[in-house]
Amino acid sequence: SGFLPLWYESVVFQLTRMPPDIAIERWICCEYPGLRDIQRRAIAEQQAKAAAVLSRDIRRMTPRKVYEVSQVMNVAFFKLMEPVTGLRLTGPYDRSPYVLRGGELADLADRLERDDHEGDVALIRLWAEALGLSGWIEWRRLDEVEAGTLH
């Protein structure tokens, strides 16, 4: 299918961006309390868009693995953002099959909590392993990446 590269890239993008985003959102919350209302609104908007994807139609159109791992990562991210925002962000996922695995990913993030590049890479690797995505990513040095490559 022509969508396969797009689905693959979206999962890899989510996997490699969420762990650093968690650290960044926590840092903003702690270091810039004046931005909390803006941050809360932005994360709530992000959650509303993500929750809209829980529809049966989208689930049917998307390869199972892609859909499931994406939802599990969403649950983890929004669970970790609840203390940041003071909002109940995981509510739409309560009756979904993604809650337990999402909670496990969130626990990995809490146990590893580091705010440096090595921590980001370690958490990405842990999430990839937990989600069965280790073979979907390959780490390269910057000088090994072709110009114009997104990931």
Which residue ranges define each predicted feature?
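Pan-zinc metallopeptidase signature
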Residues: 33-151
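An active-site-proximal "capping" alpha-helix that borders the catalytic cofactor pocket
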Residues: 14-32
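Post-HEXXH active-site segment of zinc metalloproteases
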Residues: 1-18
